[in-house]
Regions:
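Jelly-roll (double-stranded beta-helix
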Residues: 1-277, 281-284
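Short, positively charged and aromatic/hydrophobic N-terminal segments
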Residues: 274, 289-292
Length: 292
């Protein structure tokens, strides 16, 4: 993880987690590679594909294959089961795989919203030229200048996906009071003419800042994530992120009762036995159940 809420907490709100799968070459295979069926509740997952392909399916009926440049924005809301594997075509051919998965928290009043899926193709994402030599910014969510992002969100959030050519510089303007995260995926940048950043890195900017400047020492790939802090309690337990322990208990019980839906003919992980002690939860038994 480049960041995770258990370490940074409200500092990164409304964002929770960012996983970066750096470029890796996969050999051709007939085996399924990825993440099997698992649950989520209380937040959204955003998968950005740079290289390779992922086939996704969830219990709300959403799904599809995301290819290079595409984005999958899934709202887990009140509960969803889903799975993500390399697409059969990519697995058969092999090749470079590179992706980001971002978790975005949902406000308390929206945590039980129905699950939904936004399949955003590369052609649906507007791109802005930052200079005349190839630097650009894709507006996945929110707004940059007059350009509106393709994704809809539950709270004010910007997700900007950028690349900048070595020797070029650009200044970004952000809302005062908002969380601003600069995630450098590859390359090397100088921030505000003074701080050198080497990939992979996360920089959390002050909420009092309204702008920041980056200058590329190398060709660089980065994300700018900004959002209005939720200022609500965060209670997380594995694939569930709620506001208190009682809601986590409800999530576990609802999952065990099948309220997250069904993925036909898949192995479903059941958090069947847990123990409450000293104000914490500890799973003491795992079981698998085959649903047909």
């Amino acid at each position: 993880n480049l960041f995770f809420y258990d370490r940074l907490g409200h500092t990164i709100s409304p964002f929770l987690l960012l996983d970066y799968a750096a470029p890796y070459h996969f050999e051709p295979t007939t085996a399924q590679q990825g993440v099997g069926t698992h649950p989520h509740r209380g937040f959204e997952t955003v998968t950005i594909a740079y290289q390779g392909e992922v086939t996704h399916k969830d219990s709300s009926g959403g799904g599809g294959t995301i290819k290079a440049g595409d984005v999958q924005w899934m709202t887990a809301g009140g509960g969803v089961l889903h799975q993500e594997f390399h697409s059969p075509e990519f697995a058969h051919q092999g090749g470079l795989f590179e992706m980001v998965q971002l978790w975005v928290n949902l406000p308390a009043h929206s945590k039980m919203t129905p699950a939904k899926y936004q399949a955003i193709e590369a052609t649906d994402i507007q791109s802005i030229r930052l200079d005349d030599v190839g630097s650009e910014l894709r507006v996945i969510a929110g707004q940059y200048q007059e350009t509106i992002g393709a994704a809809t969100t539950f709270s004010p959030v910007n997700v900007w996906d950028g690349k900048i050519v070595a020797g070029q510089a650009h200044t970004f303007y952000v809302a005062e009071g908002h969380t601003t995260l600069l995630v450098l995926l590859s390359g090397e940048l100088i921030l505000n003419d003074e701080q050198t950043i080497e990939a992979p890195s996360l920089v959390v900017l002050s909420r009092e800042q309204i702008d920041f400047k980056i200058q590329a020492e190398q060709d660089s790939k980065f994300l700018v994530l900004t959002g209005q802090p939720l200022n609500e309690p965060i209670e997380g337990y594995g694939p569930f992120v709620m506001n208190n322990k009682a809601e986590i208990m409800d999530a576990i019980n609802d999952f065990n009762r099948g309220k997250f839906g069904v993925m036909d003919r898949q192995f479903i992980l059941i958090l069947i036995t847990y123990k409450k002690a000293h104000n914490s939860f500890r799973v003491i038994d795992f079981r698998y159940k085959v649903l047909y």
